[in-house]
């Protein structure tokens, strides 16, 4: 099997594992904050084993990562995403949660101007308009107060996910200016993910104590969500993206928002509304088309020169 084929396989495995998160969260009958805390708690050992095993030769880089503010900012953003994703999934449909969170690349485009001084291009504005129009469809339904709140929390999860990318990019730019290109951006990313899970577990600690899963099955699901759906999937994804282009990884990862509502529908009978399907399609198409054109632009310019 070629390296590219392995990359495709690894990203598809990661996206498929990620997609079971909605169903797992739905079937555990306890508080959302407790689920979030336990999920992150059980992800931590797997991530730490990788850091101190696979990256043991990069311990100096690991230590430096812990001293950098943008790495901690990325960790806080990841903790926000982890927590809000679980809360939103409990409050609204799994489809609404994952599709609204999928707008993260659009938030990156919007926030790149104030944070990175990167100009927002016409293509970005078109994608932003498409996503905002799609978002309106999610709020057209006669939502309960919980459903409306869930949609808002899902949007916050997407903003948090965008923050991870932005803050790690800021960290990379600062380190490149100070030390050249010799630092390990990959180690910084895994450190941020591990720290984010530690923070999410600490945030959920009061609910973990007061509202643990009431059944053995619930415990097994939450352990699986942490060790497999969060930690193992992330390691598969990082192994895959190292072998693929950015656009290939992005497009393959779209398997997650497609499969997530399907597993939930099969497992619980929950189905998204027609408006949510229309809005979700608009968001996925807007993000995908923007990514494809963005990837092809340098190649087209090179071919014309």
Which residue ranges define each predicted feature?
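C-terminal-most transmembrane helix of multi-pass membrane proteins
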Residues: 1, 40, 51, 254-305
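Glycine-/small-residue-enriched transmembrane alpha-helix faces in small-molecule transporters
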Residues: 1-38, 84, 129, 143-175, ...
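Transmembrane alpha-helices of multi-pass small-molecule transport proteins
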Residues: 30-80, 107-108, 160-167, 191-210, ...
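Helix-helix packing/entry segments at the starts of transmembrane helices
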Residues: 97-103, 171-199, 230-266
């Amino acid at each position: 099997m070629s390296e590219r084929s392995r990359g495709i396989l690894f990203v598809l495995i990661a996206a498929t594992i990620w997609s079971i998160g909605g169903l797992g969260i739905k079937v555990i009958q306890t508080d959302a904050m407790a689920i979030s805390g336990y999920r992150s708690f059980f992800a931590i050992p797997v991530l730490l084993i990788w850091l101190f095993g696979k990256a043991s030769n990069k311990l100096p880089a690991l230590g430096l990562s812990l001293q950098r503010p943008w790495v901690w900012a990325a960790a806080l953003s990841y903790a926000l995403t982890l927590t809000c994703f679980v809360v939103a999934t409990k409050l609204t449909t799994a489809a609404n949660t994952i599709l609204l969170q999928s707008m993260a690349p659009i938030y990156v485009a919007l926030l790149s101007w104030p944070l990175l001084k990167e100009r927002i291009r016409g293509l970005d504005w078109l994608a932003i308009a498409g996503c905002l129009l799609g978002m309106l469809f999610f709020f057209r339904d006669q939502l309960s107060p919980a459903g409306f709140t869930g949609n808002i929390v899902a949007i916050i999860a997407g903003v948090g996910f965008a923050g991870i990318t932005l803050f790690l990019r800021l960290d990379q730019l600062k380190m490149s200016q100070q030390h050249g290109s010799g630092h390990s951006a990959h180690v910084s990313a895994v450190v941020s993910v591990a720290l984010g899970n530690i923070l999410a577990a600490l945030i959920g600690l009061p609910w973990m104590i007061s509202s643990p899963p009431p059944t053995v099955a619930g415990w097994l699901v939450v352990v699986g969500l942490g060790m497999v759906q969060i930690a193992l999937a992330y390691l598969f994804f990082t192994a895959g993206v190292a072998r693929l282009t950015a656009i290939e990884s992005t497009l393959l990862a779209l398997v997650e928002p497609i499969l997530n509502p399907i597993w939930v529908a099969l497992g619980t009978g929950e189905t998204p509304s027609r408006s949510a399907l229309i809005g979700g399609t608009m968001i996925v198409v807007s993000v995908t088309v923007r990514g494809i054109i963005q990837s092809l632009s340098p190649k087209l310019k090179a071919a014309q020169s």
